[in-house]
Amino acid sequence: MSTFKRFLQYYKPYKGIFFMDLFCALIMCIVDLSFPLILSYCTGQFFLKSSNEILKGVFVLGIGLFVMYVIRALCRYYVSCQGHVMGANMESDMRQDLFNQYQRLSFSYYDKHNTGVMMSRVVSDLFDICEFAHHGPENLFISLFKIVGSFIILATIYWPLALILLTVTVVMMVFSYSQNKKMRRTFMENRKKIGSVNASLQDSLGGIRVVQSFANEDIEIDKFNHSNMEFLESKKDNYRVMGTFQGGNNFFQGLLYVTIIIFGGLFIANGDLNPIVLATFALYINVFVSPIEVLVEFTEMFQKGFSGFRRFEEVMNEVPEIQDSKNAKDLENVSGNIDFDHVSFQYTENEKVIDDVNLHIKAGEKIALVGPSGSGKTTLCSLLSRFYDVTNGSIRIDGQNIKDVTLKSLRSNIGLVQQDVYLFTGTIEQNIAYGRPGASHEEIVKAAKKANIHDFIMSLPEGYNTFCGERGTRLSGGQKQRISIARVFLKNPKILILDEATSALDNESERIIQKSLEDLSKNRTCITIAHRLSTIRNADEIVVIDATGMHERGTHDELMKLNGTYAKYYKLQFEGLN
């Protein structure tokens, strides 16, 4: 679908309002075009009649003009009110579509794109699109109708002078077209630069605690100043082009008046034109110049709106790498058997992370993955949830290839507890309920008790209605972790992934949370990724992964007797041996 056709699709639900808006704009144009003719008639004929005739007709004329302008005012109200509502509705529809698309896109998209730039598309771009969606067609319609209507009327009054005005207008349009190209380039550049500014701002504010803890405020100020100044230079370039565009058009508008005076005077001197007709031309020039100014604004609005819509379309045209297959079925009655069959994965052609992994995990079994950073432990679990697709091999749950089941049913059966806990802006209850939206308060309390966080919550003045702060800034790391565990208790999945769930906590917090995790992992297939080896001693099987793939596997005691890589890690951690 072309950009223009896609844009028009958003008008469909509001086509009644749209056409009524244009109809009201048409009425306004007719009124504006009629007044110079009425005034010309009055000065050239009506006011030259006798006093009695003028007195008889002037009140009728006044009432007619009054009604005409009341109708125009009502039309103006509709255009200003309902037209803007239509634009706001379209903006809302686009914003929802964009957000929905962001929810569908795969992790690989977010690996390559900056959040600040994505935010810019949701906020700045859509505002410009909304302004264009409402004002664009309306302004274009009014302007063209007035310009064409004025020319037709002027041509019927005295075509030689109208033809001269048309010549000046054509030159003006050629100038506008040439400047238009330059404006398009600068507006696109502006969009890129404001995205960089938003990205820099979000990065700095999101990491403000790190910034201040390292006393690196000056570095962040310099970084932001750099992107801010680049945006400023881009805007200056844009304004230079815009200034040339608007200044040139202003010159041509003045030239139209000069043309009327000079050529009109010559025609009067030759006896081909009378002063009243020239005055009528001058009145229509005012009607004619006003829409030209609106057209100038329209071109600027068009560039902003369509630049934003093209960026909007770039996202909407993105095809999620991870999607349900055509005949995908729901994953039901899950026991929790997991098979990694010759699984390999690479992010890029030259970046192989996992190579030929074969692993069978029985339902209810506790498996631990151990290895150096970058060995693919977290990636292996990401493949299980289909955040990425395997490059080679297959992953099966209860014998079903995960590519053959729906993403929603797959991920609904997998619970994830990570080191970096993300809490949404909202209350503690809302954050726990994220594990199963629609859960009752009693179910949320039950999950919190299992996660050993209920007593702490009840000690707070507002209890479960306590506001967490942005990303949970009002809570400690251990408290946030227990809330995330409560989420998974509420979700009640058959498969559990613990990804460095306690590595960032102090010993006391780890002790409390480890008990919660042990309760959580009961009767579930559990995969634990850990650097603290004390947390996995009781695992049914420990798998050591390094750059070459699966290196060792067995229970804690078996691997210690093997005296290999795992034993080395364990001794370094607990005995301080080389």
Predicted feature locations:
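An intracellular "coupling" helix at the cytosolic face of ABC transporter transmembrane type-1 domains
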Residues: K15-G16, F107-S108, S124-A133, P137, ...
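Alpha-helical transmembrane segments of multi-pass membrane proteins
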Residues: G16, F23-C24, M68-G87, E138-F145, ...
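ABC-type nucleotide-binding domain
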Residues: S325, L331-N578
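Hydrophobic alpha-helical transmembrane segments of ABC transporter permease domains
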Residues: F23, I27, V31-F35, C75, ...
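Transmembrane helix-loop-helix hairpins at lipid-water interfaces of multipass membrane proteins
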Residues: F18-C75, A155-P160, G271-P275
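Helix-loop-helix
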Residues: L48-S50, I54, V60, I153-T167, ...
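Membrane-integrated ABC transporters
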Residues: M1-D32, F47-L61, Y78-G83, G87-M90, ...
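Short intracellular "coupling" helices and adjacent cytoplasmic loop segments at the cytosolic face
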Residues: A88, Q96-D128, A199-K223, S227, ...
